[in-house]
Swiss-Prot record:
Protein name: Glutamate decarboxylase 1
Residues recorded as bearing N6-(pyridoxal phosphate)lysine in the entry: K405
Biased composition (Low complexity): 1-13
Organism field: Canis lupus familiaris (Dog)
Keywords, alphabetical: Decarboxylase, Lyase, Neurotransmitter biosynthesis, Phosphoprotein, Pyridoxal phosphate
SUPFAM superfamilies given in the database record: PLP-dependent transferases
Region (Disordered): 1-22
Upper lineage: Eukaryota, Metazoa, Chordata, Craniata, Vertebrata
Function comment: Catalyzes the synthesis of the inhibitory neurotransmitter gamma-aminobutyric acid (GABA) with pyridoxal 5'-phosphate as cofactor.
Positions carrying Phosphoserine: S78
Annotated EC: 4.1.1.15
Example of a GO biological process term: glutamate catabolic process
InterPro entries associated with the record: PyrdxlP-dep_de-COase (IPR002129), PyrdxlP-dep_Trfase (IPR015424), PyrdxlP-dep_Trfase_major (IPR015421), Pyridoxal-P_BS (IPR021115)
Subunit comment: Homodimer.
Amino acid sequence: MASSTPSSSATSSNAGADPNTANLRPTTYDTWCGVAHGCTRKLGLKICGFLQRTNSLEEKSRLVSAFKERQSSKNLLSCENSDRDGRFRRTETDFSNLFARDLLPAKNGEEQTVQFLLEVVDILLNYVRKTFDRSTKVLDFHHPHQLLEGMEGFNLELSDHPESLEQILVDCRDTLKYGVRTGHPRFFNQLSTGLDIIGLAGEWLTSTANTNMFTYEIAPVFVLMEQITLKKMREIVGWSSKDGDGIFSPGGAISNMYSIMAARYKFFPEVKTKGMAAVPKLVLFTSEHSHYSIKKAGAALGFGTDNVILIKCNERGKIIPADLEAKILEAKQKGYVPLYVNATAGTTVYGAFDPIQEIADICEKYNLWLHVDAAWGGGLLMSRKHRHKLSGIERANSVTWNPHKMMGVLLQCSAILVKEKGILQGCNQMCAGYLFQPDKQYDVSYDTGDKAIQCGRHVDIFKFWLMWKAKGTVGFENQINKCLELAEYLYAKIKNREEFEMVFDGEPEHTNVCFWYIPQSLRGIPDSPERREKLHRVAPKIKALMMESGTTMVGYQPQGDKANFFRMVISNPAATQSDIDFLIEEIERLGQDL
């Protein structure tokens, strides 16, 4: 049993005692508990249990809690070494004289590597703990010039000579310190929020494995995980489990680009070898509220942004099917060939769901490829209560679904799902001989790299697969339902208050709640260009003050001819009603004098 030195107060109170018995009979239970902390967990708990026998309930609870807390803290910085009987334990290490060259694979570099990584784990665990602590700021904002000039020794400039591991650890801490805590319960700025602990563990393991997704031979488990997960996602969309295909991509914008490439290859496979000159003048259709990535893909793939035709939306941001059909007929009359329609399930700003069934009818009528961009709204497919909002998605030819948004998977995690098997392979396959040999000893259909436009592809699947295992489909359903309930709570809280105006009438379909804060100076004033101009400046001013204070973050933007408004989105499972209350109170506090 490890020894423990009695506290100074205990030593002082025993000044006249027999020195041979002073340490055997400490005057406080805390001293004995200190001895217990130096023991193994099992023996330490026995000592605490012995001390409890004659104590009050309050003292019993305090002793065991204190012991368990200190044991837990100690164990945070130790891990089982599967190859040895002992443990890795954190020891005092002078990192100022150690460098990257002293770590593995350096000879005798194991101990330094262990101590360095334990320090990094300590940094990460402190960051995780503070992220969920609401007394911690969401961000410690500094302007770009301040960070570039250096903050308290934090230097972004690269050096010619190696810096010590001590400086590297400082850089690790500072990088997190000056970043934004996107997992904080009061971060509402983006569609991707939260910090899932299982997902975090998966990402750590993914980085440690440091492999590539292009062939089964170097990523066998990850490739199988991806296929199983994509198959499950296609089934949830409503497609046959036997058919279809898919792949994880670097984000929703790339997934949407895949869908356009697949559509073009399906109808005009010669484009792969002969280029756009070999095909008619093709046009794409998407709503005026859709994600800008559709126009960006049009530019990148050679269609041109002028040939990405925007369809009018109603006041809730949904495609007007009649306008879609009219625009298709107009394009045909002008000699263009309509190719592709993008319907959005969860628009970025309003959270609107396009009427997929009606759009699918039009696509079938004119033989067009139907893609559903469900990057933001795809998570609702996991909810029996809300999946009806995507009714008709099973009729789509392709679907974008980003688990890193509504499902809370750590960035990045986006899937492109295709109804017809073989199109991705045919569209992108180049048969690079150094990777995709046909005479391997295993089934080469598991080599997925030739389906992708990339060569190297990051392992995005493991954290998602691990979260699904940990939560189950029901866990994701509960998580998504909770976020939508919080959006309903926010809407009900502000819809009838004079300090707020809703951007559109009616309850939101998704967790997007769009509203204006009306400062005292603008209340009761009739709508006019002058009032709209003043209102346009309110949200940016409040957002700037919000970032300076660091207490919370929420996004704002204009839409069409509407003045800047706040767009509140909820996808963080850690958020609660009290966080919604705090946000509203903070907006009022920061905006009351505008």
